């Protein structure tokens, strides 16, 4: 017989069920699954060494307590014999009793016998006993019947090496059944039952039965048998449907032990935990920036490549991420699916609503360690920190002006291009920024959604409310690095620094006189002082 070794994976002949899917099967379905998997597994175990089998089997039994209990005793008995002094399986040993009380006898042929405590069947090689014991897995013993428990299977998916096992045929004393050694298991050979392997015509994977093959074929033809009753979305896997159902029910069973945040899926929790641990396993080869998720890295690499595969069919604008296109499309459709329960304001993205709600609750989670200022958004804190560091990483290629925010650069570039993509449907006025359009629309509606809790004064923009709040708190976050004088607004600081630099950017076109402030120029023009010069 050919003694060459080949790799066979149990995944080739296995049908997977998650714990959730298993609970959905009735007893008849479980019995059928058990019978099919036992047959498949026996074919592979007979080709594997005892230690390899034991490690593989026990590693897969963590979720099946009943099965682990049934198999552990057998493995302990076999361990005892393997540890006996002398050569391995075929050396004579004196009669002794295992911890389970099973008599180990010397055979007439001087070969070591292994006694199964389930049925008294005797085998002359370790792997064959393991194979035979598998047939008992799932049977109900008298002890099992008393407790109402039946042994169930949950076979591990491990790699096994096919090899030729030499020796005499193991024999079942009770049934007088001989267990012959199986031929090499390949895609061309038949199994011991003389049944041909079932082969997938698309990918050439092979399976030992038609039911396994049919389940596998779904991955190719896109069959989606599990349909959501709420929205009609279909899935090929019941576990995926269960996870999707939580979107409708609001159930979030996966809770972070650090902060209590809950998630609908375990993958969401795993990603979130990295925000606490700081783990960022996905690193960009171009710039070294690291990410918590592989998809974030994929999106990031497009910054270097300039690739923008997601194109808007309405205006032709392209995006590096599909989410960017989805959000952008809502500008054209006007869709705002996320509505605030407090004031009724709607948003195109859930994160915008989350941030908006903090205006009502007053919650500010992000605290600046330098000055103690708190922010409702993490991005607000990041931008604020640049006022301390002076960092302005985003520079205009046209004029060299730098900004601490990429969105501010994008808005600034429109000064050079003249682009005004945001147009008012009421009067046709166009704006370079979406916020400018939003503010403008309130001149038509008269809406002032942002109200001061201290004095009741209302504002059309949240930024105006934030600036107004400083009149109550006395906060002056903008300090001059030259003299230390502090100001309530950044514009005041900009004007003040010109007293140190001597810059006068505002020039009168009539007389050529320069001013440090636009208001000083406006006053100069009103008094007609330039006409006298």
UniProtKB/Swiss-Prot annotation:
Zinc finger (C2H2-type): 114-136, 170-192, 198-220, 226-248, 254-276, 282-304, 310-332, 338-360, 366-388, 394-416, 422-444, 450-472, 478-500, 506-528
Alphabetical UniProt keywords: DNA-binding, Metal-binding, Nucleus, Repeat, Transcription, Transcription regulation, Zinc, Zinc-finger
Assigned GO CC terms: nucleus
Pfam families: KRAB, zf-C2H2, zf-H2C2_2
KRAB domain segment(s): 8-80
MF terms in GO: DNA-binding transcription factor activity, RNA polymerase II-specific; RNA polymerase II transcription regulatory region sequence-specific DNA binding; zinc ion binding
Compartments where located: Nucleus
Main location: nucleus
One annotated GO biological process: regulation of transcription by RNA polymerase II
PANTHER family: FINGER PUTATIVE TRANSCRIPTION FACTOR FAMILY-RELATED (PTHR24384), ZINC FINGER PROTEIN 502 (PTHR24384:SF218)
Biological role stated in the UniProt entry: May be involved in transcriptional regulation.
Family, as annotated: Belongs to the krueppel C2H2-type zinc-finger protein family.
Annotated protein name in UniProt: Zinc finger protein 846
